[in-house]
């Protein structure tokens, strides 16, 4: 359950260590991020003890969710031996910090996991409210990517080239099916 919510139930440290060790054995070219939400239930020190066990089991990056102040970040990052990833979740327990502020607290990576979703959801609300009220989307055209811009963003022409390079299967008609001239 998300570290920003209540009523979390954690797996035991031993179970999580076993999961990290299994991921380490199975990996080829990836980094293992170990996450803990134990700060709320076990306190900062307990969460750090857990994380250090996960690191011993093979975690490459530490992630403790829902830290609530600069002291917590600085303490956590100073007591582990791997890079720390911060989670900037708007409207959560963690105060708003910039990437520079996170870096100053010892964080090597920062994620904004729901930011684009929140922005997109607000834009969709605006779109459908406009359609409901105006019956059209023209008032929002300046907020939209043009077709050319969209194709650039999604690399459309790369996919078109890939598609053209793939052989197309043709199912031959059976004896009882009519054969149609290919005039499509």
Model segments located where?
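Contiguous mixed-secondary-structure segments that line small-molecule binding/active-site clefts
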Residues: 147
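Alpha/beta enzyme core
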Residues: 1-112, 118-129, 156, 162-182
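Flexible, glycine/charged-enriched surface loops at secondary-structure junctions
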Residues: 134-142
């Amino acid at each position: 359950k998300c570290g920003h919510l209540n009523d979390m139930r954690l797996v035991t440290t031993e179970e999580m260590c076993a999961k990290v060790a299994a991921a380490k054995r199975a990996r080829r070219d990836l980094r293992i991020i170990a996450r803990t939400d134990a700060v709320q239930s076990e306190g900062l020190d307990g969460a750090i003890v857990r994380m250090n066990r996960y690191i011993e089991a093979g975690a490459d990056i530490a992630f403790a969710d829902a830290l609530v102040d600069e002291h917590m970040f600085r303490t956590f990052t100073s007591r582990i031996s791997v890079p720390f990833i911060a989670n900037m979740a708007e409207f959560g327990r963690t105060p708003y910090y910039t990437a520079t502020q996170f870096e100053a607290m010892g964080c090597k990576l920062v994620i904004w996991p729901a930011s684009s979703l929140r922005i997109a959801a607000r834009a969709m609300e605006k779109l459908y409210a406009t359609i409901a009220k105006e019956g059209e989307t023209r008032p929002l055209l300046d907020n939209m990517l043009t077709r050319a811009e969209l194709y650039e963003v999604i690399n459309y022409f790369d996919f078109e080239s890939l598609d053209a390079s793939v052989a197309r299967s043709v199912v031959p008609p059976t004896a009882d099916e009519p054969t149609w001239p290919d005039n499509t």
